[in-house]
């Protein structure tokens, strides 16, 4: 098993996080959609992290590192009402199925014990994500909604009590 470490990410980490996010999201697009590229706006040019990690006081980005190499990341939103949000989580396909995601989720829960519940959204077509969040992390699907920015159906999940 690899020795993963988690660090708060900053602006200097955006190029490497963007590289890994691009590889991970494009792999999902090929696997589930038969398309060469696919991800949220700005996922492949750094704009995603500028917009969602740096521009808001409530959001905190993390990088997942093994042997001094960034292999994944995630962004959490810690909100005043205690209903916090997992904005994104991604792992380089070369490191998937090695317990990186579950370890990252355990870290998140341990780091934010004041959280009453966690919410997240993931694309309907992202079957591996559904399994991961439901079976590995204990989330429950609570509905579906259309993502206005991307125009795709998103499954909404929750863990904990509201």
Residue ranges and their predicted role:
Residues 1-12:
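Conserved N-terminal entry element of GNAT/NAT acetyltransferase domains
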Residues 133-134, 139:
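Conserved active-site tyrosine of GNAT-family acetyltransferases
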Residues 89-96, 122-124:
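A short, internal acetyl-CoA/4′-phosphopantetheine-binding micro-motif in the GNAT/acyltransferase core
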Residues 111-124:
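Conserved GNAT acetyl-CoA-binding A-motif
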Residues 91, 97-110, 135:
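Conserved acetyl-CoA-binding loop-helix of GNAT-fold acetyltransferases
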Residues 25-50, 59:
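Conserved GNAT-fold acetyl-CoA-binding loop/helix
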Residues 78-87, 96, 114, 151-153:
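A conserved beta-turn-beta hairpin within the catalytic core of GNAT-like acetyltransferases
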Residues 61-63, 69-78, 85, 90:
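Conserved beta-strand in the GNAT
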């Amino acid at each position: 098993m690899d020795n993963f470490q988690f660090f708060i990410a900053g602006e200097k980490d955006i190029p490497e996080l963007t590289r890994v996010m691009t590889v991970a999201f494009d792999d999902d697009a090929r696997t589930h959609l038969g398309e060469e590229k696919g991800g949220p706006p700005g996922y492949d040019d750094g704009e995603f992290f500028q917009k969602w990690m740096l521009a808001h006081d409530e959001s905190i980005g993390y990088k997942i590192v093994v042997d001094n190499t960034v292999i994944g990341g995630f962004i959490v939103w810690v909100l005043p009402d205690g209903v916090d949000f997992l904005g994104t989580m991604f792992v380089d396909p070369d490191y998937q199925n090695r317990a990186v995601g579950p370890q990252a989720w355990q870290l998140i829960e341990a780091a934010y014990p004041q959280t009453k519940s966690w919410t997240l959204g993931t694309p309907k077509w992202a079957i591996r994500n559904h399994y991961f969040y439901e079976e590995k992390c204990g989330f429950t699907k609570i509905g579906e909604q259309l993502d206005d920015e991307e125009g795709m159906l998103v499954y909404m999940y929750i863990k904990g009590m509201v």
